[in-house]
């Protein structure tokens, strides 16, 4: 594929998003403390301007994991029928993001796919270092597989998904599910990190001006 500039690959809507982010002129996340970065991400989470879809069910609950912690979760469903369910992990580099920052996205996924979505607040670094997030992700998937019926969901149509770091967790869960015989219907992965290196041609091509900038 040949193109003149990386910007030429963007849709007008995405160019507008990047323009608004540039005008906001906020400090890079890596210059902030974890608390400051999370607050900044939270305040800017409506940058995509997704409409807040009204759904038949939006329920907050908790999922217990191996060390006794209870992971906060939110169920979205467009109807009260027995629906397929997507377990969704938010993005944020394993350090920022939450159920609330991805509320609009999960509402849209539930509405457009006509399925239930369960979004989870896995624990974040640096307070909770590896493998805590990975354990939280896998434990919530196993719990949902065993308790979907109690939530009025179809345990036989279970999927995992996520964006960025959440996509990484979803891919990991899919591999563990394969190896342990836990059946999944599909993976829904939005730009997951699935390699240990960051030196591909696309990293260099989009190093500046595309949300995640290469450090100087």
Q: Could you describe each region identified by the protein language model?
A:
Residues 1-71, 75:
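A glycine/proline-hinged amphipathic helix-loop "lid/cap" segment
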Residues 83-92:
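Short beta-strand element of the alpha/beta-hydrolase
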Residues 100-120:
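Short amphipathic alpha-helix adjacent to the substrate-entry channel of hydrolases
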Residues 121-125, 193:
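Short beta-to-alpha linker loops that shape the active-site pocket of alpha/beta-hydrolase fold enzymes
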Residues 145-160:
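Gly/Ser-rich "nucleophile elbow"/oxyanion-hole loop immediately N-terminal to the catalytic nucleophile
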Residues 160-162, 190:
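Short beta-strand immediately N-terminal to the catalytic nucleophile in serine-hydrolase-like folds
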Residues 162, 166, 170:
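Gly/Ala-rich beta-loop-alpha elbow adjacent to hydrolase catalytic centers
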Residues 175-216:
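Hydrolase active-site cap/lid region
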């Amino acid at each position: 594929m040949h193109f003149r500039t990386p910007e030429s690959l963007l849709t007008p809507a995405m160019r507008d998003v990047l323009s608004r982010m540039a005008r906001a002129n906020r400090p890079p996340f890596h210059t902030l403390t974890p608390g400051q970065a999370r607050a900044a991400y939270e305040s800017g989470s409506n940058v995509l301007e997704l409409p807040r879809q009204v759904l038949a069910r939006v329920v907050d609950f908790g999922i217990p994991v191996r060390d006794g912690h209870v992971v906060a979760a939110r169920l979205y469903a467009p109807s009260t029928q027995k629906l397929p369910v997507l377990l969704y992990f938010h993005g944020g580099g394993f350090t920022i993001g939450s159920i609330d920052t991805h509320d609009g996205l999960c509402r849209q996924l539930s509405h457009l796919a006509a399925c239930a979505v369960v979004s989870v607040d896995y624990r974040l670094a640096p307070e909770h270092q590896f493998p805590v997030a990975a354990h939280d992700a896998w434990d919530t998937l196993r719990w949902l597989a065993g308790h979907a019926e109690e939530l009025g969901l179809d345990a036989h149509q279970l999927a995992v998904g996520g964006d960025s770091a959440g996509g990484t967790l979803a891919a990991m869960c899919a591999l563990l599910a394969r190896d342990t015989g836990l059946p999944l219907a599909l993976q829904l992965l939005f730009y997951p990190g699935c390699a240990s290196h960051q030196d591909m041609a696309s990293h260099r091509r989009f190093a500046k001006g595309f949300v995640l900038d290469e450090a100087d």
